[in-house]
Amino acid sequence: MNQIDYYQAKLDFEIDSAELFAALQADQRKLVVVDARPAAAYAKEHIPAAINLPYSNMSNAMVRKLDSDKLYVCYCDGVGSNASTKGAFNLASLGFEVVELRGGLDGWKHDGYTTETTHDASSSA
């Protein structure tokens, strides 16, 4: 694979905070934001409207209720964490269209977007 193909492929499977925010504002029904971190991290802080689907628990049974016609955007803490990559890999392996949020939750906050908390860490898919 040459450099151009590599970077094009990388761009095809990533989204940045501004793109995600715009997509959520335009039509939230077309995508699902997936927090691939453990439930405790999700409960402490997550992107609004995100569902918690820890990468370590993804299975056919767990994702059965997910809509295969939607685009799934996986994220984790950010640089230094690969939970979103593992989550994206798992979802793609199960037949879902998925991209990764570049910069994760740290990048989302750094770009000035809000987060929320939940007391019910079981509010997953």
Pin down the residues of each PLM region.
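Short, hinge-like loop/turn segments at secondary-structure boundaries
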Residues: 51, 68-69, 115-119
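Short amphipathic alpha-helix with an adjacent loop that forms part of the alpha/beta core around
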Residues: 23-24, 59-69
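Conserved beta-strand scaffold positions in the cores of enzyme catalytic domains, especially
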Residues: 33, 50-52, 98-100
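Flexible, polar/low-complexity N-terminal or interdomain linker segments that lie immediately upstream
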Residues: 1-32, 36-41, 117-125
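Glycine-rich nucleotide phosphate-binding loop and flanking beta-alpha elements
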Residues: 40, 59, 80
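Short loop/helix-cap segments at secondary-structure boundaries that form the rim of catalytic
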Residues: 42-48, 108
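Catalytic cysteine-centered active loop of the rhodanese-like fold, especially the PTP/DSP P-loop
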Residues: 64-109
